[in-house]
Amino acid sequence: MYVWLRLARTMLTARSRGRYRMGDESRLSFRCLPSDIDSNLHLNNARYMMLADIGRIDIFARAGLIGLARRHRWAPMMGGLQSVYVREIRLWKRFDVVSTVETWEGTQVIGRHRFVLQDGRTAALVLTTAGVYDSGRGGFVPIDEIVSALGANIRPRPPSEEERIFMAS
């Protein structure tokens, strides 16, 4: 079940997981398949990024960002990522990808994607920065504007110094 099938499954089942609100988490369950592994018989490093993408897309779909972006001709874009691998995910093992919106400032948002084994231990952590580009205005949209357009009335926690550096990179 390569990326397109996993993505289709995520999109088709998004409504069953309910609306995403800032502060919630997206939890998607997967199994490490033969198409996911490297020569060490564990999840290939590139697959972590692909599965984090699916976690982000789940948040976008459930929050209403995909429809909003289409209406405004906006395009969500990755800015950067950091990854830490703690434990391997072996072939056929089940795991969850738990994705959250951590904070934002200006036009940048930080996402967190934790890969959780069945016993609750963290296998990997991927942090991402992203923004939403408005091709009509020729620039990135302030995240507060997006959050407001999604009908949420929430303020982010202040980013730490490390998070600000990450968003600026």
Predicted ranges, named:
Residues 23-33:
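Short amphipathic
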